[in-house]
């Protein structure tokens, strides 16, 4: 059965522990911040934190959705922390980041679904760190393109929204999110002239043809940056891994994506949407 699949050697994870890792951890904790690195049990946390990079998660740590692949806490979120934008901006300054990546939980409980908090965070980061480029990984805002426009108007350099998986499997693993709604979000980002980026997981039972079809869909929507990584089951409550995709097939996907016309492609077992994000500017 899928949940008993043995993890292959190519998925060995590097643990952190150097001085820079400790400094990153200290900055994050002292400013009472959340990161997707910890909440999502990211396999690259050791490497990234040891390089002094982290992906900040705003809007609190409790998500209003319960996607079957995700390890983030779900339930009724706390009110937004008005100090969070300033704390994120100051942490970026202390870490001396040239490129900052921000994501968020879904806040379907808020009238504007968290869009104004996104805007405040991006603008505060840019005020405090004028030389830092900003990449944001946004939710679908329930398909409300007026809210997507608000984020675009805050002028981040890259806006990412993850498709997560192929069309057929999407309803099984994404809570409330819809494949075509995500495409509409990405299309709006690209239409506004911002670099549009998306990421998917493989190993959920998709076929090669379905992955190639997704590439065509997002390319047609205007996406220029694509990341592909192995789905890893973060806990027993999450959907089990269907398959551990070989490095050779990841390379095949990378070549196919490049041939189709994507400008930047990351495709390897441990790739996540914010992995080596500074290269995507």
From Swiss-Prot:
EC number: 2.8.1.8
Localization per record: Cytoplasm
Source organism (scientific name): Parabacteroides distasonis (strain ATCC 8503 / DSM 20701 / CIP 104284 / JCM 5825 / NCTC 11152)
Record's keyword annotation contains Coiled coil: no
Radical SAM core domain location: 49-263
List of residues binding [4Fe-4S] cluster 1: 37, 42, 48, 274
Ligand binding ([4Fe-4S] cluster 2): 63, 67, 70
Cofactor binding comment, as recorded: Binds 2 [4Fe-4S] clusters per subunit. One cluster is coordinated with 3 cysteines and an exchangeable S-adenosyl-L-methionine.
Record-linked Gene3D superfamilies: Aldolase class I
Reaction equation(s) it catalyzes: [[Fe-S] cluster scaffold protein carrying a second [4Fe-4S](2+) cluster] + N(6)-octanoyl-L-lysyl-[protein] + 2 oxidized [2Fe-2S]-[ferredoxin] + 2 S-adenosyl-L-methionine + 4 H(+) = [[Fe-S] cluster scaffold protein] + N(6)-[(R)-dihydrolipoyl]-L-lysyl-[protein] + 4 Fe(3+) + 2 hydrogen sulfide + 2 5'-deoxyadenosine + 2 L-methionine + 2 reduced [2Fe-2S]-[ferredoxin]
Signal peptide: none
Keywords: 4Fe-4S, Cytoplasm, Iron, Iron-sulfur, Metal-binding, S-adenosyl-L-methionine, Transferase
Protein name from the UniProt record: Lipoyl synthase
Iron as UniProt keyword: yes
InterPro entries, A to Z: Aldolase_TIM, Elp3/MiaA/NifB-like_rSAM, Lipoyl_synth, rSAM
């Amino acid at each position: 059965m899928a949940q008993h699949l043995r993890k292959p050697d190519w998925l060995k994870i590097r643990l952190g522990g150097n001085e820079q890792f400790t400094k990153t951890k200290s900055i994050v904790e002292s400013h009472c911040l959340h990161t997707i690195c910890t909440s999502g049990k990211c396999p690259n946390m050791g490497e990234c934190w040891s390089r002094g990079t982290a992906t900040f998660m705003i809007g609190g740590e409790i998500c209003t959705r319960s996607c079957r692949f995700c390890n983030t806490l779900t339930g009724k979120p706390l009110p937004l922390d008005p100090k969070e934008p300033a704390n994120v901006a100051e942490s970026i300054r202390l870490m001396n980041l040239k490129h900052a990546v921000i994501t968020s939980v879904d806040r379907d409980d808020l009238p504007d679904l968290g869009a104004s908090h996104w805007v405040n965070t991006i603008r505060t980061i840019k005020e405090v760190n004028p030389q830092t480029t900003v990449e944001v990984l946004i939710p679908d805002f329930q398909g409300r393109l007026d809210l997507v426009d608000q984020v675009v108007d805050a002028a981040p350099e890259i806006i990412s929204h993850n498709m997560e998986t192929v069309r057929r499997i999407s309803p099984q693993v994404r809570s409330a999110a819809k494949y075509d709604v995500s495409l509409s979000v990405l299309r709006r980002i690209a239409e506004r002239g911002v670099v549009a980026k998306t990421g998917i997981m493989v190993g959920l039972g998709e076929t090669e043809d379905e992955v190639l079809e997704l590439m065509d869909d997002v390319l047609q929507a205007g996406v220029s940056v694509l990341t592909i990584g192995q789905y890893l089951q973060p806990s027993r409550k999450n959907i089990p891994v269907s398959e551990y995709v070989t490095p050779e097939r990841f390379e095949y996907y990378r070549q196919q994506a490049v041939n189709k016309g994507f400008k930047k492609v990351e495709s390897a077992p441990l790739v996540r949407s914010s992995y080596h994000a500074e290269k995507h500017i």
